Amino acid sequence: MDAPVPLSLSTLLELCTNLLQKSVNKSNGRFTAQLVHCRVIKSGLMFSVYLMNNLMNVYSKTGYALHARKLFDEMPLRTAFSWNTVLSAYSKRGDMDSTCEFFDQLPQRDSVSWTTMIVGYKNIGQYHKAIRVMGDMVKEGIEPTQFTLTNVLASVAATRCMETGKKVHSFIVKLGLRGNVSVSNSLLNMYAKCGDPMMAKFVFDRMVVRDISSWNAMIALHMQVGQMDLAMAQFEQMAERDIVTWNSMISGFNQRGYDLRALDIFSKMLRDSLLSPDRFTLASVLSACANLEKLCIGKQIHSHIVTTGFDISGIVLNALISMYSRCGGVETARRLIEQRGTKDLKIEGFTALLDGYIKLGDMNQAKNIFVSLKDRDVVAWTAMIVGYEQHGSYGEAINLFRSMVGGGQRPNSYTLAAMLSVASSLASLSHGKQIHGSAVKSGEIYSVSVSNALITMYAKAGNITSASRAFDLIRCERDTVSWTSMIIALAQHGHAEEALELFETMLMEGLRPDHITYVGVFSACTHAGLVNQGRQYFDMMKDVDKIIPTLSHYACMVDLFGRAGLLQEAQEFIEKMPIEPDVVTWGSLLSACRVHKNIDLGKVAAERLLLLEPENSGAYSALANLYSACGKWEEAAKIRKSMKDGRVKKEQGFSWIEVKHKVHVFGVEDGTHPEKNEIYMTMKKIWDEIKKMGYVPDTASVLHDLEEEVKEQILRHHSEKLAIAFGLISTPDKTTLRIMKNLRVCNDCHTAIKFISKLVGREIIVRDTTRFHHFKDGFCSCRDYW
């Protein structure tokens, strides 16, 4: 038998190179590379830079950065490709520290080197660094390629920073790359993510060549801004559609509440295309079934998933659990969790299951499921906390959060947002600050949902400055909730003009308000007495933003007219409402009648309110107070007697203050506090001092026919005054006092607290049922209009 003829070095070199090039993107690439590597060493082919570069490239693309680096170090000669290959290997594994270190060693940096750095930072979510690297690249005189620009635009889209995006766009025009399809598609996506549909359309209309991605981007954009008809029109124009096209249509209709249309598009996809639904398709159609409570269709989709062998995990599992939980199939949802575990379970899926049991009135079963879980991850903990928070069990939520953190579980943005909501509901600044600290430690402080919750928490706890800081923290990532939360916060704290300026800025930024935003806008107009602006915004809401007014909007407008003394206009507004006024609407009118002493209209408002809620103590009290304020003591007594006969209990006024993490509650003439003697003595001293300063007790605020001396004593012992006295003796000088009250602050307390703030040299913040009052140096932020 003849011996094999040995291969020449040139033939062996060619063979090894071909093997490597064919294996670059294959699963066995690393194995092939190792075989070739051994052959290279045995045959002494280390001299071939071309072969070594190919070998390094395989190691790099298969994730073996250390192998690539070792080979690089052994090479006698290196090219720019050699350096960039190792750089890419480090970047692909997400090791940007090593990538930066190696980048600094490069003898010469070309566009590939810089782009590798940009891609690396983008892939690990450090978008701002990716953008900065491109800036450095341009300063070095290196011209970006289309691949550089598409990755930079993706980073800009992720940060949603429009100003940066426009600068990159201008640079693209200068480079003459706006005709490139990939770059134009990236521009489309960037403008869509940044919320500028006009610029996105501008780019699309000027594209000479469009591919499926171009059309998909415009469909997604139309869906994002609620232009479903335009999205449908572009969908119909497309000669070719991919799975992204169908998903954009289905998810767009689903997210906008057009769930039947989403299911219709899904049916059309199955009927007219050869494409199979992917996990995003299935998640959207299951969500549509959940919203429509179509259990039958949901079961059919579940059956399709099982029969086609589709993997039930991730978003599909969550969508199935949500669908069954919301459609009355809670037990099926529970069995799915038992079978699949909670590894892939998202907060929405687990919360849907909890809500399913809670809707059945079975919170214990929800708790039992939680307790039975062997491996409780952050999702399980968060779902239970959210469940407690949504159902007002704040103590349980706090205790569970402490157990979670104490057990070493790190909270996520959902956990922190829920706990901040708990702190908001309790108006507890100390709890809120603790959660804020947890957000900083966990790195979730830059999450939009956490920042939005921080804005609300600080606002409700009386710290508008910290609320503004939280708002500023997410300058490039604000959503409608962010703007709305800050507008409402400013309105509640008496900064009405700032609230309206912020609203106008929001519009200029290209964001459209929702129905809650307008509640904040009307509230700002109400607190500042801006009647004409309120009318204009009401018309704008209907005509420009096409928002159908709800009872909340109508009640706000009645409150606006009523506080301004336009009682006749308020009444006419109610009469023209296309929907039946509710308790809040009539209550706003009744409250205005009490302030402006209009007995006749007040009686009408009270009667209509009591027809809706016969046991509403507030209506009886407001009418009795109206009679008392007008000197009609007998009529007031009759109202109080009818309350007694009807066993309607008047809501008692309380004020509370948090000192050293403990809440102290006070009622009128409260004698239950352990430090009552010192509190009463302090209040007596303050009373005498502010009278010397010019304070005159408003005995008309005591709505009982009593002696003036008795009235004055009652005024001195109102709950908010006692809370202030306790705060003064329990906190260091210059400490801001924050008082919460469950009823409206009376005229006398409002006047007295202005004098007290000047006397003691402190800011006193009082939150009542209508707004925050910031008392400082003898003045109040409400300007005596509340």
Swiss-Prot record:
Belongs to the PPR family. PCMP-H subfamily. PANTHER family: DYW DOMAIN-CONTAINING PROTEIN, PENTATRICOPEPTIDE REPEAT-CONTAINING PROTEIN. Transmembrane segments: none annotated. This is Pentatricopeptide repeat-containing protein At2g22070. InterPro entries: DYW_dom, E_motif, Pentatricopeptide_rpt, PPR_At4g14850-like_plant, TPR-like_helical_dom_sf. PROSITE patterns: PPR. One of its GO terms (biological process) is RNA modification. It holds the Pfam family E_motif. The keyword Phosphoprotein does not apply. It comes from Arabidopsis thaliana. It comes from the Eukaryota.
